């Protein structure tokens, strides 16, 4: 190694990701596919501006906004559940990778178009009126509890610390950042995210095979 100069000191190499600029237009506004599932599923996606590296603040703020709009404490979630329009697992999440960010809503429903319209109406209502202050505080407390709860388990704690470290932050910094988020921040963010012109919808219909499998299991029992 020394003979070939492999032991000599070299300047640190920096990995550079070559990402093509992502347009804010949609590749497709609607798509339907069939899969081996027992009940119809749907997904709504909103294309957002990519978040800079290490910007966990915006990601956390988006998550709090979703909690206010369709979380378990929101009036929309209660209505959808009480009227049987979707399953208990319906909810929203933030998906961010280098050069890309989107906000997703997924669930099971026999009336996905009704759910979509109710969701869009609720987004517009909250955009105009502002997030419910009490629900926002409850969502912040819930998020804070999740951060602390993960520290009680070795595996969860290690995973959480690694995720934050890869973004150049610590758990303590995340907790401080969470404490600094306000309902006014959410109101301001809602003016430029979750825009209907950047929304795409995916319908996933049963292909019939999953129903047959369930019938076979019931027969065996």
Regions inferred by a protein language model and the residue ranges of each:
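Short amphipathic alpha-helical surface patches that mediate protein-protein
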Residues: 2, 85, 120, 124, ...
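Short acidic/His-enriched helical or mixed secondary-structure segments at domain edges of catalytic enzymes
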Residues: 32, 39, 75, 79-87, ...
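A common structural junction motif
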Residues: 1-11, 84, 121-131
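Residue-level signal for cytosolic alpha-helical hairpin/rod architecture
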Residues: 62, 100, 120, 171-172
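Non-catalytic beta-strand/loop surface segments
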Residues: 7-55, 67-113, 117, 176-200, ...
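Bilobed periplasmic-binding protein/Venus flytrap-like ligand-binding cleft at the lobe interface
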Residues: 60-72, 119-124
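C-terminal structural cap/anchor segments
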Residues: 98-144
């Amino acid at each position: 190694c020394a003979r070939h100069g492999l032991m000599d000191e070299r300047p640190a190499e920096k990995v550079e990701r070559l990402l093509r600029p992502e347009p804010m237009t949609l590749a497709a506004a609607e798509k339907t596919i069939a899969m081996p599932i027992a009940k119809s599923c749907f997904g709504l996606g909103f294309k957002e501006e990519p978040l800079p590296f290490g910007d966990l603040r915006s990601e956390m703020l988006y998550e709090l906004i979703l909690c206010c709009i369709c979380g378990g404490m929101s009036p929309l979630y209660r209505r959808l559940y009480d009227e049987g329009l979707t399953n208990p697992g319906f909810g929203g999440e933030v998906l961010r990778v280098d050069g890309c960010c989107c906000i997703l809503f997924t669930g099971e429903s026999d009336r996905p178009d009704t759910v979509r319209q109710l969701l869009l109406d609720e987004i517009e209502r909250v955009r105009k009126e502002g997030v419910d202050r009490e629900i926002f505080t409850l969502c912040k407390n819930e998020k804070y509890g999740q951060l602390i709860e993960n520290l009680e388990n070795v595996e969860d704690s290690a995973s959480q610390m690694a995720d934050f470290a890869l973004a150049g932050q610590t758990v303590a910094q995340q907790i401080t950042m969470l404490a600094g988020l306000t309902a006014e921040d959410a109101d301001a963010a809602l003016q430029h995210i979750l825009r209907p012109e950047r929304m795409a919808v995916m319908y996933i219909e049963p292909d019939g095979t999953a129903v047959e499998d369930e019938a076979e299991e019931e027969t065996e029992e």
